């Protein structure tokens, strides 16, 4: 498929055109940098203030501002991104609103709408625009394929207290991913989800240094530490490269063993 040629370095994604949403920090930022290192041309999409404050270690990212709560803005930003790239091979839908909203009994309509609008509807609209661009650029013809990677969460299939809106929206992303995989297979578009567990988005192991959070990680994560954004980005590279050509409708869980056991299961094991 066509690319704009912002990056010409050899790598596993050489010649590929990619869009990453939620690109200004954490997993999104690490994915942008990993894709650039692997030779892709990359549009980094996020809220304007966040993009303005972001400096990538790898040169070449094309910043485009977009608010995932604004439906019209999504279509416009995606069209701009595809035009500037000259096509689209890879979409990483990672933009999300994080955090809890209190007990379910106190969950307001406004908070529910806010989380669903960004995390669920924003993902849907981004992926629909991306898939349409991929088909228009020739995905599914002459053996050409494309990739959509959603960023879910262990909360896509595991609940936690006082986060009903976030958990429900992330669960929706999981099923949307599977539905897209089925519908888009005929067009050569492979769709998969990455489900991270606790990730230190500061990137320097300080995000979980607060004693309560540190103890929680020790109790709940088999590896005894939070993940790093770069460890999640590694999976995003794998799912985007040619070697993943028979993987679709699947989830890669990156949680250090959190979902493999009962919460608190490591409490005795570390003594």
Swiss-Prot record:
Transmembrane annotation, as ranges: none
Enzyme class at the top of the EC tree: oxidoreductase
InterPro entries (alphabetical): NAD(P)-bd_dom_sf, Sc_DH/Rdtase_CS, SDR_fam
Catalytic residues of the enzyme: 166 (proton acceptor)
Record protein name field: N-acylmannosamine 1-dehydrogenase
Amino-acid positions noted as binding substrate in the UniProt annotation, renumbered to this chain: 153
GO terms of molecular function: N-acylmannosamine 1-dehydrogenase activity
Additional observations: NAM-DH may be applicable to the quantitative determination of sialic acid in serum.
Similarity comment: family membership: Belongs to the short-chain dehydrogenases/reductases (SDR) family.
Species this chain originates from: Flavobacterium sp. (strain 141-8)
Annotated binding of NAD(+), by residue: 20-44
EC id: 1.1.1.233
Protein purpose: Acts on acetyl-D-mannosamine and glycolyl-D-mannosamine.
PROSITE patterns in alphabetical order: ADH_SHORT
Catalytic reactions of this protein: an N-acyl-D-mannosamine + NAD(+) = an N-acyl-D-mannosaminolactone + NADH + H(+)
């Amino acid at each position: 498929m066509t690319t704009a040629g912002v990056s010409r370095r050899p790598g596993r994604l050489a010649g590929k055109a990619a869009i990453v949403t939620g690109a200004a920090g954490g997993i999104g930022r690490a994915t942008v940098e990993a894709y650039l290192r692997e030779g892709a041309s990359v549009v980094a999409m996020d809220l304007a203030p966040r993009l303005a404050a972001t400096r990538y270690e790898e040169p070449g990212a094309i910043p485009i501002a977009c608010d995932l709560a604004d439906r019209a803005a999504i279509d416009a930003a995606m069209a701009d991104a595809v035009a500037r790239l000259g096509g689209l091979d890879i979409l990483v839908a990672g933009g999300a609103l994080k955090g809890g909203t209190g007990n379910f009994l106190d969950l307001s309509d406004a908070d529910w709408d806010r989380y669903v609008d960004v995390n669920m509807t924003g993902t849907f609209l981004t992926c629909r625009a991306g898939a349409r661009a991929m088909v228009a650029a020739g995905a599914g013809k002459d053996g050409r394929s494309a990739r959509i990677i959603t960023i879910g969460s262990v909360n896509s299939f595991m609940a936690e207290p006082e986060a009903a809106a976030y958990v429900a929206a992330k669960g929706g992303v999981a099923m949307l991913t599977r539905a897209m995989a089925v519908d888009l297979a005929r067009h050569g578009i492979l769709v998969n989800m990455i489900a991270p567990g606790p990730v230190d988005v500061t990137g320097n192991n300080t995000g979980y240094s607060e004693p309560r959070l540190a103890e929680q990680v020790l109790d709940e994560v088999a590896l005894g530490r939070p993940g790093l954004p770069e460890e999640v980005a590694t999976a995003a590279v794998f799912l985007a490269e040619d070697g993943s050509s028979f993987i679709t409708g699947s989830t890669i869980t990156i949680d250090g063993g959190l979902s493999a056991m009962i919460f608190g299961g490591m409490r005795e094991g570390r003594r």
